[in-house]
């Protein structure tokens, strides 16, 4: 297929790069050049594909989801606390089968696309995500989840799952997800670290989500004793670092309860912290300290988590929650939902920005005009609904969001 120039009224390539009357050269599913003026478009001499009065942006990147848990939407209230919620999740999930999980992933992928998300970091414990994601649809980093709850009898099975994880495919990238330092034994965590070093695949791990986690990790105390048998006797971040997993290829999900100096350690290591605003609100947690993380120099990303702890899979809502709760600049919030997410899933330069060499994963939003400040304000307030979503330059949704 010959190169084409995709034009629109305005293009937000990334925060700080705004184009009026220009366009993007697309070829082979990627952005081959950014044309910053009508004159540059004319000089390109290529076939034009004009989207009209729209604002063109990169697709949003959902850095943390559990699409398979769509089977539990609205079924698990948080009233009795986090550990009780986990117990209910385990019991409820046991009643679902492969078809249920596959259906949940497919429906979840459609919901993400409808809200302008074109790439997701999806934690997969059932194998369902690999059957649905990619292949010209939603782009996905599929994190294959393992845990053994400190039970050596389960470690071998978890290691086998890691060694037998499928290869990536079109629009699908494989990753590793040791569930959390409190549910993964030192042996299994070390194996994940070794595998990440050898494969270069991205890693996602839940960390510091609740105070109960720290109580269990360090002292073997608290409600986690109902679920687990052996406390590691160390802080979670120390366990992650000892396994070789504290680095640029790792996403630390939640990060709500930290000790002095841990933010700086994470910044030096280059790991990404993923905040899930909807889940945070679901459990009624204290405000997430965005500014402390930003001042420490940590890369931040946003995720929806699952429908078991959120009422939607809409990154527009997640951005709006951050705006309402933290009072951050719209450009910073947009960066978390695009550039930050791309770093989290290990696809920086390929998704999350409209730059030369990136995949042409684009969203067109209705736009009557205005500058970048107005655009970022509207985008991060959740005021706009996509009119078209493209993956690798091919329309997937038009006018039905």
Model-based region annotation:
Residues 55-56, 73-136, 159-168:
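Alpha-helical scaffold segments that flank or form the walls of functional sites
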């Amino acid at each position: 297929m010959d190169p084409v120039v995709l034009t629109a009224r305005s293009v937000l390539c990334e925060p700080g790069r705004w184009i009026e009357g220009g366009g993007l050269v697309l070829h082979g599913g990627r952005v081959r050049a950014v044309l910053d003026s009508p004159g540059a478009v004319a000089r390109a001499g290529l076939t034009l594909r004009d989207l009209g009065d729209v604002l063109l942006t990169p697709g949003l990147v959902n850095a943390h989801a559990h699409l398979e848990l769509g089977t539990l939407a609205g079924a698990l209230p948080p009233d009795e606390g986090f550990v009780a919620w986990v117990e209910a999740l385990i019991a409820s999930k046991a009643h679902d089968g492969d078809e249920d999980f596959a259906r949940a992933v497919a429906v979840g992928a459609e919901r993400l696309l409808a809200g302008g998300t074109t790439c997701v970091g999806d934690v997969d414990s059932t194998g369902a995500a690999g059957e649905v994601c990619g292949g010209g649809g939603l782009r996905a980093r599929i994190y294959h989840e393992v845990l053994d709850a400190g039970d050596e009898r389960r470690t071998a099975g978890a290691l086998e799952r890691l060694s037998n994880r499928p290869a990536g495919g079109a629009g699908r990238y494989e990753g590793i997800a040791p569930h959390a330092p409190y549910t993964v034994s030192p042996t299994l965590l070390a194996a994940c670290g070794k595998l990440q070093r050898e494969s270069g695949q991205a890693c996602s791990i839940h960390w510091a989500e609740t105070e109960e986690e720290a109580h269990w990790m360090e002292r073997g105390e608290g409600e986690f004793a109902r679920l687990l048998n052996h406390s590691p006797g160390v802080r979670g971040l120390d366990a992650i670092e000892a396994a070789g997993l504290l680095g640029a290829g790792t996403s630390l999900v939640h990060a709500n309860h930290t000790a002095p100096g841990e933010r700086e350690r994470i910044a030096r290591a280059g790991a990404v912290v993923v905040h899930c605003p909807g889940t945070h609100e679901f459990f009624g947690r204290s405000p997430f300290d965005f500014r402390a993380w930003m001042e420490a120099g940590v890369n931040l990303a946003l995720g929806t988590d699952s429908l078991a702890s959120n009422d939607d899979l809409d990154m527009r809502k997640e951005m709006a929650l951050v705006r309402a709760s933290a009072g951050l600049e719209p450009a910073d919030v947009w960066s978390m939902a695009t550039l930050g997410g791309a770093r989290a899933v290990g696809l920086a330069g390929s998704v999350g920005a409209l730059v030369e060499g990136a995949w042409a994963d684009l969203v067109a939003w209705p736009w009557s005009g205005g500058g970048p400040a107005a655009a970022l304000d509207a985008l991060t307030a959740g005021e706009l609904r996509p009119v078209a979503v493209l993956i690798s330059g091919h329309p997937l949704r038009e006018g039905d969001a």
